[in-house]
């Protein structure tokens, strides 16, 4: 008799075998599911507070995705030998899981909910994000919490005209698409993707295909809940105070409508604050007892109805535009004099200062992932300080939102970057958001494309991004191009599309309601393309192509190819040679395992000197060639002469002059520069040199008579004895 009431469900999903179980591990959590997808094993747990905190006016959901190094059979680095702060991938995956789960909790549910997903085992070929999302959904479903799920998810690839379901890492490396889609049985809720300039039709097809295939996982979760789920919570939303709603509407509706006739964000925000304060004061004067949070929520609902109603009725949007118009755009390049590339991209009240810096291979980011260590030559960092929205706040390490926006912009630009063998620089872009009123991540894409071209990075084409919104009510809907911050909060869907004039490079969708059909998404994508092409036209007019010359402040780069066996000679004992080269020439020198040496410096003279010295260190001595040598040591039967760095040979006494030489020191001295010809090299690399042969070949003296038989053999024997 076991102490566990374990329920297990197994199913085949594409090329993967999946096993879900509940009832054995983490039984004190509200819900827990262990999911195994071809040896990638994740444990998802959910805990929900039984009661909300007093005064709580928002839904406090936290999602934490945590990777354990033991999952890959590793011990963490560093002094403490344990996992530290979340990596960028953990942060991004936490956001990926949060986004489709959050809209499925009922309105008015303010109990704290924490979802924690641990990666316990990793198959390097099976990414853990899809198993983690499905496991989190299953844990919520079995917990009994008020949750309108379950949610399914799928990764979709695209190659040779075919969609791939949950491709492994090897397949993803050659796929033209990496798209993650999540949703319920009836609707898509979230899309995250990177693409190689694909058409809207292919992208939409991938979303539909992924939604169809995720039903397998959703059905398995239903089976798990049926056999292993906990009782559903008896939770009901608090009834609306209709009398208070009517009173607040009476006091504030007209003023709110007037506020939304103000086109400038700062003036509108100020007016809205005044309305909120005024309504609270009037309620107090009238003797109406009301919770401030409840009043604010009613006013926000009124705002939403005003904005949505105006748009659906065909009236102008908040800032006076129609639904298809992009805000005015201003572009300026080479903004910063010492930066390698920079641009200032302004679209309405959203502005991004994007700066490019070029570095060498040693500047690449080394990422120690569960799947193994790898290097990243392209970084994009997004920062949005509080002053961008006219507020005060914390300034410091990036928050989840900043990390996510930076990754989206990076995804959009990766497909147009030149390969490393054509442009060997490490590239870092930093987007500093200096103003924000919606769509700052897409401003980062546009500004990033311009900054790359300004830096002389030969990208394939400009990339532009546009943020879209959608409002759906009954059978009416409106798609909004280039949404404002307020439209983002009040709409039913926001999606961001980035790409070139040839196709989409990145797509991100977040859908807050169910009922958005394939046809609606088709209209939205077509309108987004129209907006993207408009922005691309502005960017093309401002900068038609990448600069042909790098900034004078950017490092120049040359490459030298050497025999890989010579790498140790360039490095030297304990790194002494490479350190001396770097210090004396002022260059950065990177050595690849294949023998490719990259020399970078802002000084062309320093690069030339470093190249000359490396070629000297690695040069192979050629028989029959004449060299400038230096006498290192005198011997009774000749001298040791250095002809190349680390290359010494024997100048036999018989090869010094045509006449008989009795005393070597009568002809050469230690430290003397001499011209010598390499006569031969034996199987051990020992070299025979000749001054008289060099002079004869260069015309200084007649060609010497052939050497007597056996003389060469005697000299060779003497050289061997000396070097041994």
UniProtKB/Swiss-Prot annotation:
Family the UniProt entry places it in: Belongs to the polyribonucleotide nucleotidyltransferase family.
**InterPro entries, alphabetically?**
ExoRNase_PH_dom1, ExoRNase_PH_dom2, ExoRNase_PH_dom2_sf, KH_dom, KH_dom_type_1, KH_dom_type_1_sf, NA-bd_OB-fold, PNPase
**Where does the protein principally reside?**
cytoplasm
Highest taxon in the source lineage: Bacteria
What EC designation does it have?
2.7.7.8
- What job does the chain carry out? Involved in mRNA degradation. Catalyzes the phosphorolysis of single-stranded polyribonucleotides processively in the 3'- to 5'-direction.
Pfam families in the record, alphabetically? KH_1 (PF00013), PNPase (PF03726), RNase_PH (PF01138), RNase_PH_C (PF03725), S1 (PF00575)
Q: Does Transferase show up as a keyword for this record?
A: yes
GO biological processes: mRNA catabolic process; RNA processing
Q: Where is this region: Disordered?
A: 697-724
Q: What is this protein called?
A: Polyribonucleotide nucleotidyltransferase
Coiled-coil blocks: none
Q: Which GO terms describe its molecular function?
A: 3'-5'-RNA exonuclease activity; magnesium ion binding; polyribonucleotide nucleotidyltransferase activity; RNA binding
Needed cofactors? Mg(2+)
Residues in domain S1 motif? 624-692
Name one cellular component (GO) term: cytosol
Compositionally biased spans, kind Low complexity:
701-724
Q: Which residues are involved in binding Mg(2+)?
A: 488, 494
Does the keyword Transferase belong to this entry?
A: yes
């Amino acid at each position: 008799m076991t102490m566990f009431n374990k329920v297990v469900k197994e199913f085949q999903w594409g090329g993967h075998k999946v096993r879900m179980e509940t009832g054995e591990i983490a039984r004190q959590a509200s819900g827990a599911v262990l999911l195994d997808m071809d040896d990638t094993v994740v444990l998802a747990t959910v805990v929900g507070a039984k009661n909300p905190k007093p005064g709580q006016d928002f839904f406090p959901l936290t999602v934490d995705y945590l990777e354990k190094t033991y999952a890959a059979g590793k011990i963490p680095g560093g002094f403490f030998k344990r996992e530290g702060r979340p990596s960028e991938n953990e942060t991004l995956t936490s956001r990926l899981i949060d986004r489709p789960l959050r809209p499925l909790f009922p309105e008015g549910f303010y109990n704290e909910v924490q979802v924690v997903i641990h990666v316990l085992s990793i198959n390097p070929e099976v990414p853990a994000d899809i198993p983690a999302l499905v496991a989190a959904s299953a844990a919520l479903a079995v917990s009994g919490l008020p949750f309108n799920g379950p949610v399914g998810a799928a990764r979709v690839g695209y190659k040779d005209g075919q969609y791939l379901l949950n491709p492994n890492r090897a397949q993803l490396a050659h796929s033209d698409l990496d798209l993650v889609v999540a949703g319920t049985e009836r609707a898509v809720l979230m899309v995250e993707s990177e693409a190689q300039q694909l058409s809207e039709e292919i992208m939409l097809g991938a979303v539909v295909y992924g939604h169809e295939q995720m039903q397998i996982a959703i059905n398995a979760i239903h089976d798990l809940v049926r056999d292993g789920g906990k009782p559903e919570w008896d939770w009901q939303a608090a009834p609306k105070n209709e009398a208070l709603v009517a009173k607040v509407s009476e006091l504030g509706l007209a003023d709110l409508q007037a506020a939304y006739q103000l086109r400038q964000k700062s003036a509108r925000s100020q007016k809205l604050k005044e309305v909120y304060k005024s309504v609270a004061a009037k309620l107090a004067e009238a003797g109406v007892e009301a919770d401030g949070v409840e009043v604010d929520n009613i006013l926000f609902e009124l705002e939403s109805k005003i904005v949505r109603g105006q748009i659906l009725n065909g009236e102008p949007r908040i800032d006076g535009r129609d639904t298809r118009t992009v805000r005015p755009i201003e572009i300026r390049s080479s903004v910063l004099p010492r930066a390698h590339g920079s641009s200032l991209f302004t679209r309405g009240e959203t502005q991004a200062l994007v700066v490019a810096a070029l570095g060498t291979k040693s500047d690449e980011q080394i990422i120690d992932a569960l799947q193994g260590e790898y290097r990243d030559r392209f970084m994009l960092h997004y920062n949005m300080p509080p002053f961008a929205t006219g507020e005060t706040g914390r300034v410091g390490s990036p928050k989840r939102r900043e990390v996510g926006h930076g990754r989206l912009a990076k995804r959009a630009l990766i497909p147009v970057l030149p390969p490393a063998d054509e442009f060997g620089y490490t590239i870092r872009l930093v987007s500093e958001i200096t103003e924000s009123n919606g769509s700052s991540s897409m401003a980062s894409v546009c500004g990033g494309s311009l900054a790359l071209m300004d830096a002389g990075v030969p990208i394939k084409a400009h990339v532009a991004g546009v943020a879209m919104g959608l409002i759906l009510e009954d059978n009416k809907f409106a798609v909004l191009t280039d949404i404002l911050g307020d439209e983002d909060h009040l709409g039913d869907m926001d999606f961001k599309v980035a790409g070139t004039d040839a196709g989409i490079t990145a797509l991100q969708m977040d859908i807050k309601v169910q009922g958005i059909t394939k046809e609606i998404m088709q209209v939205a994508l077509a309108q987004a393309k129209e907006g993207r092409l408009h922005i691309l036209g502005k960017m093309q007019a401002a900068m038609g192509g990448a600069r042909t010359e790098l900034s004078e402040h950017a490092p120049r780069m040359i490459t030298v190819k050497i025999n890989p066996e010579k790498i140790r000679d360039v490095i030297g004992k304990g790194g002494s040679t490479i350190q001396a080269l770097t210090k004396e020439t002022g260059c950065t020198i990177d050595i690849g395992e294949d023998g490719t040496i990259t020399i970078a410096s802002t000084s062309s003279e320093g690069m030339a000197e470093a190249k000359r010295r490396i070629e000297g260190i690695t040069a192979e001595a050629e028989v029959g060639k004449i060299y400038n040598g230096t006498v290192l040591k005198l011997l009774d039967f000749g001298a040791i002469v250095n002809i190349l760095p680390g290359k010494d040979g024997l100048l036999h006494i018989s090869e010094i002059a045509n006449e008989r030489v009795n005393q070597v020191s009568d002809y050469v001295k230690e430290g003397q520069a001499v011209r010598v010809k390499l006569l031969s090299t034996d199987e051990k690399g020992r070299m025979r040199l000749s001054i008289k042969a060099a002079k004869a070949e260069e015309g200084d003296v007649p060609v010497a008579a052939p050497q007597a038989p056996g003389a060469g053999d005697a000299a060779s024997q003497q050289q061997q004895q000396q070097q041994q």
